Amino acid sequence: MDEFHRCGKEDSFWQPCFLYPLFFQEDLYAISHDHYLDVSSSSRPMEHLSSNDQLSFLTVKRLIGQIRQQNHSIVLFVNCDPNPLADRKKSFYSESVLEALTLVLEVPFSIWSKSSVEGMNECKSFRSIHSIFPFLEDKFPHSNSILDARIPYSIHPEILVRTFRRWIRDAPSLHPLRSVLYDYRNSPENLQRSIIVVPRVNTRFFLFLLNYYVWECESILFSRLKRSSHSRSLAHGSFPQRTHFHRKIKHIIIFSRRNSLKSIWSLKDPKIHYVRYGERPIIAIKGADLLVKKCRYYLLIFRQFYFHLWSEPYRVCSHQLSKNCSSSPGYFLRVRMNPLLVRTKTLDELFIPVLITNEMDPIVPIVPIIGLLATEKFCDISGRPISKLSWTSLTDDDILDRFDQIWRNLFHYYSGSFDRDGLYRIKYILLLSCAKTLACKHKSTIRVVRKELGPELFKKSFSKEREFDSLPFSSKAAARSQRERIWHSDIPQINPLANSWQKIQDLKIENLFDQ
């Protein structure tokens, strides 16, 4: 596979033209066979296969022909079907073929994605959740509108195959993909409907489809954004001191008019910025309302004509940051005016100018979080803690660890907010819910539990806060907590409660448009 990748770099024309012969390479199925065994053994216990159940290359070749038959859809997608009728042996061979198909399609996709990232160096593309928060800090205060453009989750199988056809000239290599996608629908009456391109099972094939679909959407959008902005992004900021002027001069370009001795100085400042987390791209725009309407109209038309997909209007929402809040990602986001007093002393007199700067103000959604905790049976709808009855069968250490993990995730994720006082209300709810759960398990009272455990109750989270407050750069963290914030760098992913709250917000928007 590495050799094929090197050949694809040396000859870009050969790479997309001869993919179909790879389906008949025994090494390819050996790789997919080993990968399937590793995934199966890690996810669930698997019986030892006898010598007659080992991978047979002739059987795989026969199965390639059987994929095109309609009556083998249950065999291929046994893990997706709620009523599987195929045996394990057939599922084993079908999963091997799916792994082989994914390996073949991943080779050109890896080359395309790498070349596209190399071509977007001026766009400063970062692929990490930690790049979301610097984006919010840097771009949101200097934008007056945002577009919340959710990626369409459904697309017709033939449209997806044709997007592959634009990049792969080898048409026979796409026949297995077309057969797999059409068999995935499992019923002839759904021929006119669209399929969901979200992985219903944790297989490599469906994850690849999702990644390719998102990459296809973003590659077109990036090319359009680069046309609208021919220079890289500049970090905004006020420069009240002369020592900071060199930062500004570095981002100034000079060009001359024809037949003119005058030079024009232009500050490189694009007006459109893009970020994405999950399936929710966010486009920050600095401009008039007409520019925002044009961008929203372009996104709707782009999805309609490029993917032949009608996108509901509520899936592309525009917000004015100065008037109302936006929800992203798990925060209420707004932009507030922050007056900055600058004293400039000269020889003659003293000037005291006042600079008005914008600052992003992320707000912790306390009421929605309490509602989610009530849904998970940690408290009632009014925020009164209750016992988690489903956890009473666990050990005391497991109960303490689970409550501690929930609080640590919430505290770390929402530490970037200025006002974190509402988080301690959440901590109070979790603390009493944990005590009530332990009291219900041991058939005692909360007073007895708190007397027996003492500092052991939420000990880890308390020590984590003390460790954070005792850092050298935050010796006065208690006094500065209301005016400074630090984003924790150990956030591995979007908080699950933030995802749940975001889904509730999406349902509210959909119901509003349905009315």
Curated annotation (Swiss-Prot):
One of its GO terms (biological process) is tRNA processing. It is found in: Plastid, Chloroplast. Keywords: Chloroplast, mRNA processing, Plastid, RNA-binding, tRNA processing. GO terms for molecular function: RNA binding. It holds the Pfam family Intron_maturas2. Disulfide bonds: none annotated. It comes from the Eukaryota. Its main location: plastid. GO terms for cellular component: chloroplast. PANTHER family: MATURASE K (PTHR34811:SF1). Belongs to the intron maturase 2 family. MatK subfamily. Usually encoded in the trnK tRNA gene intron. Probably assists in splicing its own and other chloroplast group II introns. This is Maturase K. It comes from Pinus yunnanensis (Yunnan pine).
